[in-house]
């Protein structure tokens, strides 16, 4: 089984994060400030070079104004 970072589902996850960030009207810098990280952290996530744990994903979702269950439901919808 390939590493999860190389799976197609990860690409969908990354696209969803980017889409929610843009819908929230946030730049990578603004999002990174909200989560207490540097801009390169968000850039690496969106380029698929950085894995996220569940807590980091939750923090990102909250910073974008979406709760984690809603985000996961949108992810599942895109994956189906």
Where are these regions (language model features)?
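Conserved hydrophobic/aromatic packing and binding residues within compact polymer-binding modules
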Residues: 17, 31-32, 42-45, 71
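DNA major-groove recognition helix of helix-turn-helix/homeodomain DNA-binding modules
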Residues: 55-70
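A short, Lys/Arg-rich alpha-helix, primarily the initiator
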Residues: 1-23
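Recognition helix of helix-turn-helix/homeodomain-like DNA-binding domains
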Residues: 36-52
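Short basic helix-loop element that most often maps to the first helix and adjoining turn
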Residues: 15-34, 59
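Helix-turn-helix/winged-helix DNA-binding modules
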Residues: 12, 23, 49-52, 63
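Short amphipathic recognition helices of helix-turn-helix/homeodomain-type DNA-binding modules
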Residues: 70-80
């Amino acid at each position: 089984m390939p590493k999860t970072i190389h799976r197609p589902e990860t690409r969908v996850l990354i696209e969803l994060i980017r889409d929610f960030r843009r819908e929230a009207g946030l730049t990578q810098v603004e999002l990174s400030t909200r989560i207490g990280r540097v801009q390169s952290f968000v850039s690496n996530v969106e380029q698929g070079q950085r894995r996220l744990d569940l807590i980091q994903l939750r923090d990102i979702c909250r910073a974008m104004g979406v709760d984690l269950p809603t985000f996961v439901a949108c992810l599942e919808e895109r994956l189906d």
